[in-house]
Amino acid sequence: MKNSMLEAASLLLEKLLLISNFKIFSVCAPGGGTGKKHPYEINSFLRGDVLEVSRTHFTHYGIYLGDNRVAHLMPDILLALTSDKERTQKVVSNKRLLPGVICKVASIRVDTVEDFAYGADILVNHLDETLKKKSLLNEEVARRAEQQLGLTPYSLLWNNCEHFVTYCRYGSPISPQAEKFHETVKILIRDQRSCLASAVLGLVSIIYTGLASYMTLPAVCIPFCLWMMSG
């Protein structure tokens, strides 16, 4: 029962995070950058470096493999629709990205630096400073990334691009972005002033989706579950 409650709470958190990023996916170019050509100093990147590109409300990460290749985790609905590599290897568009997030379909793929960054400025190994963790040797980082290439389940909270690079770089998958969002939601739900807002949100969900039992129960119980798991 406890696991079911946590799964329901997890699902709500993911949907909230998805909604918060919906505008980003809708109005930005693929990957969230400007799409404009940007002169990248590829020769300054070392195999195994973590490349980081800032977005409006989130950050995207990848592992540099050398020879203008970056391994990164990307949601892509096309992976569930076809096995044609010629189609799936093309740069992931917004029309493929958002449905991929919703359906939790993704892959760890290799793109050029330009396609990965899509016009955004690149930071190199910035996570080393922000996380204050000792990194593995660059060659080991790159090997780990190469071993992960291929299909992977996607989760905004538990298996995103940041989890991928931190596993490769430090040996354990973590995502400060997801953790920060998770803590923020717990604080809001735990705050008594948010109880009414949570109830209204549940009521709106029921009205919008209908009174189907599979939606009614989560809409009523999830705010309570979140409060219970806030410890």
Swiss-Prot record:
Molecular-function annotations in GO: O-acyltransferase activity; O-palmitoyltransferase activity; phosphatidylcholine-retinol O-acyltransferase activity; retinoic acid binding; retinol binding
Family according to the record: Belongs to the H-rev107 family.
* Disulphide connectivity of cysteines: none
For the protein in the UniProt heading, the enzyme class is: transferase
Where in or outside the cell it occurs: the entry states: Endoplasmic reticulum membrane; Rough endoplasmic reticulum; Endosome, Multivesicular body; Cytoplasm, Perinuclear region
GO (cellular component) term, any one: perinuclear region of cytoplasm
Broad class of the protein's primary localization:
endoplasmic reticulum
**Record pathway:** Cofactor metabolism; retinol metabolism
Membrane: is it a keyword of this entry? yes
The positions flagged as active site in the entry are H60, H72, C161 (acyl-thioester intermediate)
Control of this protein's activity is summarized as: Inhibited by all-trans-retinyl alpha-bromoacetate and N-boc-L-biocytinyl-11-aminoundecane chloro-methyl ketone (BACMK).
- This protein is called what? Lecithin retinol acyltransferase
Source organism per entry reads Rattus norvegicus
- Where does the sequence pass through the membrane? 195-215
Per the record, ranges on the Lumenal side are: 216-231
* Role this protein plays: Transfers the acyl group from the sn-1 position of phosphatidylcholine to all-trans retinol, producing all-trans retinyl esters. Retinyl esters are storage forms of vitamin A. LRAT plays a critical role in vision. It provides the all-trans retinyl ester substrates for the isomerohydrolase which processes the esters into 11-cis-retinol in the retinal pigment epithelium; due to a membrane-associated alcohol dehydrogenase, 11 cis-retinol is oxidized and converted into 11-cis-retinaldehyde which is the chromophore for rhodopsin and the cone photopigments.
